[in-house]
Amino acid sequence: MIENQSDNIDIKENDVLNQDNAPEDNSSAAEKTIENDELSPQKTEEINTEELKNTISNNDARLEQLEKEHETLKNQYVRISADFDNFRKRQSRDQDDLKVQLVSKTLTAILPIVDNFERARQQLKPESEEAQALHRSYQGLYKQLVEVLKQQGVSPMRVVGQQFDPNLHEAVLREPSEEFKEDLIVEELQRGYHLEGKVLRHALVKVSMGHGQQNSQEEVEKDTVEEDIDSEENTSEDV
């Protein structure tokens, strides 16, 4: 009985001691929690700042990469656009050249007919009324041909008295002339034509050798004659 009471007293003392110690433990835990609460915002801020720096750095790198890609695509677009524009111009130019070639071929085939009409007009001198009527008839056809040529952009060359130009003219004959200086065209043997500023057919012409060339030629002939005479005289003396 006495022992039981003693045990109860011991238990109560232990409870009292535990109660005395409990506030101290709770206070220590609370202090640790407060310290953790005070350090947490600073650490969080440091972590957030580092993450933000990394994010900004990654975004800058991505932006730089996108700018490079944009510049590359822009250059490709400009180059493709320029190539397409050049292709379009080249196609248009080729079509124009082909058109000119086809028109030139057709008109060149017509020009000999025009030449025949012009020669006939110069040579024929109709006297009777019937001949004059026929002359007027084919001259009307000639005028129609000339008008068609004009509508197609064909224009005749005017060459007499002009400086000889191998790009425009073809020299068939050369002869001395007192009227025309050297390399001037004396006569048109076959008319030349332009088509839209380009040569459709070269003019066949006679070109002057100049007055000096005539004198030189006469002197050469005179020297040749004198040499022949001297040769004959020497032959006679030998005989």
UniProtKB/Swiss-Prot annotation:
Keyword Chaperone tagged: yes
One GO cellular component, as annotated: cytoplasm
InterPro entries xrefs: GrpE, GrpE_coiled_coil, GrpE_head
Region span, Disordered: 1-50, 209-239
Pfam family, one: GrpE
Comp. bias (Acidic residues): 218-239
GO molecular function: adenyl-nucleotide exchange factor activity; protein homodimerization activity; protein-folding chaperone binding; unfolded protein binding
Localization per Swiss-Prot or TrEMBL: Cytoplasm
Domain of life: Bacteria
SUPFAM superfamilies xrefs: Coiled-coil domain of nucleotide exchange factor GrpE, Head domain of nucleotide exchange factor GrpE
Compositional bias per record (Polar residues), positions renumbered to this chain: 16-30
Keywords recorded for this protein, A-Z: Chaperone, Cytoplasm, Stress response
GO BP, one annotated term: protein folding
Role according to the record: Participates actively in the response to hyperosmotic and heat shock by preventing the aggregation of stress-denatured proteins, in association with DnaK and GrpE. It is the nucleotide exchange factor for DnaK and may function as a thermosensor. Unfolded proteins bind initially to DnaJ; upon interaction with the DnaJ-bound protein, DnaK hydrolyzes its bound ATP, resulting in the formation of a stable complex. GrpE releases ADP from DnaK; ATP binding to DnaK triggers the release of the substrate protein, thus completing the reaction cycle.
Assembly mode: Homodimer.
UniProt cross-references to HAMAP family, sorted A to Z: GrpE (MF_01151)
Entries under PANTHER family matching the protein: GRPE PROTEIN, GRPE PROTEIN HOMOLOG, MITOCHONDRIAL
Record family assignment: Belongs to the GrpE family.
Protein name, entry field: Protein GrpE
Organism: Prochlorococcus marinus (strain MIT 9312)
